[in-house]
């Protein structure tokens, strides 16, 4: 998802043309969302009925808990979880149901990160139950954002090396500072190295929340991989060994049961599903956003984006996406954990939750549903201690910087493209000594109008 206060994202893409060169990516995003603003008429489905604008259902004690977490310093919260901050009934409210499925939080995740989200998105509390303010790209983000940026870079002779895995960084001493002087890597399995010159800089994307992901198929379930089934985590472990200033990857890699979930993409050649969901929800594809199936044992949610979702998508094909947060619980219609289900079984469960029975056989026959198991997809949300995430430019290094979801940036929130772009901008401006800083994080909590709207909304929807 995107929203209007992703200032680093829009700053970067304000100079990147779309693939057709008609306008900048930033302008395209704002133009598109002006044309089709998100306004859900079916944020939750419960008991076979759509709930258009669910009441938050918070008690005064719950609201006081939110206010306390929002105001408590991060140092005092420490490595405690969200569950440590609230009574169990909080996690039965519509507010939590919508918050956790929109952002993929679990009760055992970091209370510090939850606090950051509360502050970062204070301006979205009013209207959150209809997803007001959430923005989308015209196509999927790869076609709408990654490809234009890659094209712009390639035109400026940036080289992209594929099928290459960096295995180690050799850190030497240079005037009392650590300096990367060699990069070890494997290209198609063959070891090699790059010598780093005195005027060279090394910027590393640290860790990966999509590392070791695996795909299933229509008739097979994805496997659950681990941190050694890829290079991102092993690289971080190697360079951080004995160097506390480079962080502690084990804080994010060693609790897969707390960081995994399953997503799926369904490709449909029969228009029945989209027609039925459109008629049921009252939203056209691309308008409503996330639909959470509140009764689902898997806590499954789906999104029907505007079609076509991919550049070059055939006219007779429609695509939607979904995911589940409780992937180890048996389904309500398919008595298997979501993590053990094939694509056909996942789609069968979704059809059952939506009470689509008459057309189910035809939809299943003409669809391909691909499940994806992502063991580390919410690893950036896991409880952490100070120092587990290194600084963008680690203390005592001369030519090294980190980017991505696992370096430390004050105030901003992970699991966003904004965090990645902010870290990259911080790395470049710092390493090269540029007289620039990234746009400041928007802090709506200091705007009295924003606070009043949020306060009013929360208290109007109490139980």
List the model feature ranges, each with a label:
Residues 162-182, 186-189:
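A conserved short coil-to-beta-strand element within the FAD-binding core of flavoproteins
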Residues 19-123, 135-136:
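Rossmann-like flavin
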Residues 114-127, 150, 161-165, 170:
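Catalytic cores of nucleotide-enabled group-transfer and carboxylate-activating enzymes in metabolic
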Residues 122-137, 195, 199-201, 206-422, ...:
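C-terminal segments that line or cap access tunnels to active or ligand-binding sites in enzymes
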Residues 1-6, 131-154, 160-165, 336-339, ...:
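Short beta-strand to alpha-helix junction loop
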Residues 1-21, 26:
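Glycine-rich FAD cofactor-binding loop and adjacent beta-loop-alpha segment at the N-terminus
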Residues 8-15, 98, 144-155, 345-353, ...:
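Amphipathic alpha-helical segments that form well-ordered structural scaffolds
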Residues 430-463:
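Active-site-proximal substrate-binding core of FAD-dependent oxidoreductases
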């Amino acid at each position: 998802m995107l929203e209007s206060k992703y200032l680093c994202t829009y700053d970067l893409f304000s100079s990147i043309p779309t693939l057709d060169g008609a306008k900048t990516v930033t302008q395209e995003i704002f133009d598109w969302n002006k044309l089709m603003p998100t306004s859900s008429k079916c944020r939750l489905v419960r008991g076979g009925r759509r709930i258009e604008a669910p009441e938050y259902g918070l008690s005064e004690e719950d609201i006081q808990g939110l206010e306390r977490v929002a105001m408590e310093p991060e140092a005092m919260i420490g490595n405690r979880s969200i569950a440590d901050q609230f009574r169990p009934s909080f996690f039965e409210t519509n507010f939590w149901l919508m918050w956790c499925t929109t952002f993929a939080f679990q009760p055992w995740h970091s209370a510090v990160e939850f606090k950051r989200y509360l502050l970062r998105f204070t301006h979205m509390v009013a209207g959150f139950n209809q997803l007001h303010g959430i923005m989308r790209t015209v196509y999927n983000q790869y076609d709408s954002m990654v490809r234009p940026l890659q094209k712009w870079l390639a035109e400026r002779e940036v080289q992209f090396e594929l099928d290459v895995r960096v295995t180690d960084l050799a850190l030497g001493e240079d005037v009392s500072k650590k300096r990367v002087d060699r990069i070890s890597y494997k290209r198609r399995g063959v070891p090699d190295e790059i010598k780093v010159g005195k005027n060279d800089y090394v910027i590393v994307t640290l860790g990966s929340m999509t590392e070791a992901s695996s795909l299933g198929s229509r008739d097979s379930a994805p496997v659950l991989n681990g941190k050694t089934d890829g290079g991102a985590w092993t690289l971080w472990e190697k360079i951080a060994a004995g160097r506390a200033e480079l962080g502690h990857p084990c804080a994010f890699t060693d609790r897969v049961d707390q960081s995994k979930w399953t997503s799926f993409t369904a490709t449909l050649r029969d228009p029945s599903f989209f027609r039925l969901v459109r008629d049921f929800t009252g939203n056209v594809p691309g308008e409503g956003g996330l639909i959470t199936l509140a009764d689902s044992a898997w806590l499954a949610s789906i999104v029907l984006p505007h079609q076509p979702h991919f550049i070059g998508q055939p006219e007779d094909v429609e695509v939607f996406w979904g995911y589940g947060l409780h992937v180890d619980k048996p389904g309500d219609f398919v008595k298997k954990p979501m993590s053990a289900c094939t694509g056909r079984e996942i789609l069968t469960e979704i059809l059952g939750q939506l009470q689509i029975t008459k057309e189910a056989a035809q939809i299943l026959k003409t669809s391909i549903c691909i499940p994806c198991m992502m063991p580390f997809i919410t690893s950036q949300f896991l409880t952490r201690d100070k120092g587990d995430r290194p600084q963008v430019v680690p203390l005592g290094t001369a030519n090294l910087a980190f980017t991505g979801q696992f370096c430390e940036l004050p105030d901003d929130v992970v699991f966003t493209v904004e965090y990645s772009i902010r870290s990259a901008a911080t790395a470049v401006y710092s390493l090269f000594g540029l007289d620039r800083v990234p746009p400041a994080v928007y802090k709506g909590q200091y705007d009295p109008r924003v606070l009043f709207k949020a306060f009013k909304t929360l208290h109007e929807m109490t139980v």
